[in-house]
Amino acid sequence: MNRRTFAKGVALLGAAGPAALARGAAEKPEGTLGEYYEEPARKLPVRKFDVVVAGAGTAGVVAAIAAARQGAKTILIERKGYPGGTVTEGGTALHSFFNLWKAFPGVEKRQVVKGIPQDIVERLTKAGGTSGHAEMFAGYNYDSVCTAIDTEIYKLVVFEMLAEAGVTVAVNTLLAGAIVDGQRVRGAIAESRSGREALYAHALVDCTAFGDLAAFAGAKYTEPNDYPVVNSMGVAGVSVERYYEFLQSHGAVSQLAKGWRSGKEGQIVRLDTNGKAFPQEFKDEARKIGLAMVITTVHDDYFMFIKMGLKMPVSPTSRDAVAAAELELRRRQAKAIELLNKHVPGCEKAFIARTSPTLNIRRARVIACDYDITSPDVLEARHFEDDVMAYGFHDSAPRLQVKGGGTYGIPYKALRVAGLENLLAAGMLITSNHDAHMSTRNTVCCMGQGQAAGTAAALCAARKCGTRDLPYRDLRDALVKAGVVLCES
């Protein structure tokens, strides 16, 4: 059975998921016990929207707000009980609203991502939930600005912004399938404790990180499994200043940014190390558990993000492999606290105050789109005739940097899912090339992609046109009006 047949089966039969249909469930008579079970056909209640956004993470939140601000009746589906995604669970900070000007003397400082992402930062600032755009004083060949956040305040702020925009926010709701008619995606199947339902829309946006909606719809994809998975934790009972003094005394500070922390300006909000200060026992054990000591914080006595990582043998779409990784990562977190207590000044009384509810990925499925952004596109600072945002950060810096501290463009065609109409994608599920993806997957880039995709979806719904029929000029005008920066170089 091919993906197209599978997708139609999900839509028409209301099947619970891929396994039941993909393995030929129809071969068994209804009610027969055996290797497979065929779910009986059932009618699902229908709700109609202009735009469906799947996944309320980094890209999805912004996509839904953007669509609703354009006047589209929008629903946002999220399996957890809150919006936020990787921003609140696995990131170290928001990277990056600015070009890498500090690494290139004479290059102008420019904020290249604005629009809804900047609206979020301004709301966080009012709520005391961000460092602000904190300038880097060390390690600025990696990033010129660090924007640290409070994970819990972020969840509240974006939840409120979604409500204010008029988005129907369906948290605690699973995406269970796609409704497909030929090459056109007509809607999504959602399931919650309120029941199973069909959500019809004129345009849909997949922001699930895993590419679940696109996969259900029959899109082509690959699963490169080229990154480790992580679980991040927040660590309390620490002294940021004592830890900094320890690193500084050994010449071990590799990154340093200062901004707002606990209501005071000019405080350390980001701190990384080259590892020189740590005893060999700590280094050896930290390496075994994949411990990364990149610290960001907006509170005294708290490290907002410390990560444990591991490389899975298979893609993080594997349920059983993920279960094993979830357990192992939590064991590693406990070991990390032991190491901090024993070896690191300022961390003698450290304890786990927060963990991610599930492991964090950098990608799982890579969804084929009309255009696949390449590494030369990123590194050579290329722009396109259909740019929907500009971006200038690369997570492999200083080894890889956008040329001359400039920016490259994300084209609209890179957000259109190949072979399907009415379906867009945004976030870490686009871009197959690893080096290019090391830029496009980052949080602020995902946010910008979300604004573009949500805006495009709303315009398609208003004009009753397909995602490939939308005039670029209309999309460009709407994005610029909403504060998006385009055509920077």
Question: Model regions: which residues?
Answer:
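Conserved N-terminal/central alpha/beta ligand/cofactor-binding core
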Residues: 30, 66, 72-73, 79-177, ...
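Flavin (FAD/FMN)-binding glycine-rich loop and adjacent Rossmann-like elements that form
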Residues: 41-42, 86-88, 128, 155, ...
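A short, basic/flexible loop-to-alpha-helix module at the beginning of a structural domain
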Residues: 33-48
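N-terminal Rossmann-fold NAD(P) dinucleotide-binding loop
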Residues: 60
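Beta1/beta-strand and adjacent pyrophosphate-binding region of the FAD-binding site
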Residues: 46-57
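N-terminal export signals
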Residues: 5-26
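A structured beta-alpha segment of the ubiquitous adenosine-cofactor-binding alpha/beta core
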Residues: 162, 172-175, 189-198
